[in-house]
Amino acid sequence: MSVNLKGRSLLTLLDFSPEEIRYLLDISKQVKMENRSKLRTERFKGMTLAMIFEKRSTRTRLAFETAFAEEGGHPIFLSPNDIHLGAKESLEDTARVLGRMVDAIMFRGYKQETVEKLAEYSGVPVYNGLTDEFHPTQALADLMTIEENFGRLKGVKVVFMGDTRNNVATSLMIACAKMGMNFVACGPEELKPRSDVFKRCQEIVKETDGSVSFTSNLEEALAGADVVYTDVWASMGEEDKEKERMALLKPYQVNERVMEMTGKSETIFMHCLPAVKGQEVTYEVIEGKQSRVWDEAENRKHTIKAVMIATLL
């Protein structure tokens, strides 16, 4: 099957087929090898990327900015002080203006509706760098990291521990379903996966021979796991719920005992970062030999560069 993603936006991986995701991962491998050899091809020379941030960022900003600049492009950082989406000027009109000025737009903020409207009205590729609902570029980096470790994706068992309805867990569940993996969400009933996306993923795995499931039982979830993944207990904008979340999620902390419960010495630990060491994960695990969080963070750049290559060239 010939894959052509030119002009496409990345808003959620629900919009992408397994073949298209595979295409992006193959480009990611290529650009990572180029990066290792310090090869710079200036693929984006003469192009401009608008990067709109409603939420602060380390990895997403670094990944988009370095990926675009390394290839000769000009990234423009726009903070809430620089651009007011929907204030004084409608979001639709701002999108139209941006589309006349730049070649692509990255948005990191709150509402999924915002990134969708930017894509609808700008006429250029738009990339979701994180919304309250989805984090697709993180999920691509997660897939790349898993494949680097196991040489495959199909059949790999991934367990997400903690707040399983957050944007990272949601996008990881979609990615695993699309690629025929076995995804287990493990957390309290109060924070189980979004029912609409969970149902969509249950339909997807019928075609990909994967599986998606939810349980609050650690032993059931962790048995035979290849990957144990977690995220902060209170996401950005939810800091006021931290005490409540700590009480709910303490049983789901990833520690050495949890890693041993997989029954596999080759199980790896992943985290999208930033991490609160001592809360969702212990220092010993995130700094231990099973941790792949730094590879995962680096792979944000390579997968993001791959997305831009595929959609702009």
UniProtKB/Swiss-Prot annotation:
L-ornithine binds at N167, D231, S235, M236. Pfam families: OTCace, OTCace_N. It catalyses: carbamoyl phosphate + L-ornithine = L-citrulline + phosphate + H(+). GO terms for cellular component: cytoplasm. GO terms for molecular function: amino acid binding; ornithine carbamoyltransferase activity. Pathway: Amino-acid biosynthesis; L-arginine biosynthesis; L-arginine from L-ornithine and carbamoyl phosphate: step 1/3. Keywords: Amino-acid biosynthesis, Arginine biosynthesis, Cytoplasm, Transferase. GO terms for biological process: arginine biosynthetic process via ornithine; citrulline biosynthetic process; L-arginine biosynthetic process. Carbamoyl phosphate binds at S57, T58, R59, T60, R108, H135, P136, T137, Q138, C272, L273, R300. It is found in: Cytoplasm. Its EC number is 2.1.3.3. PANTHER family: ORNITHINE CARBAMOYLTRANSFERASE, ORNITHINE CARBAMOYLTRANSFERASE, MITOCHONDRIAL. Reversibly catalyzes the transfer of the carbamoyl group from carbamoyl phosphate (CP) to the N(epsilon) atom of ornithine (ORN) to produce L-citrulline. Belongs to the aspartate/ornithine carbamoyltransferase superfamily. OTCase family. This is Ornithine carbamoyltransferase. It comes from Thermotoga maritima (strain ATCC 43589 / DSM 3109 / JCM 10099 / NBRC 100826 / MSB8).
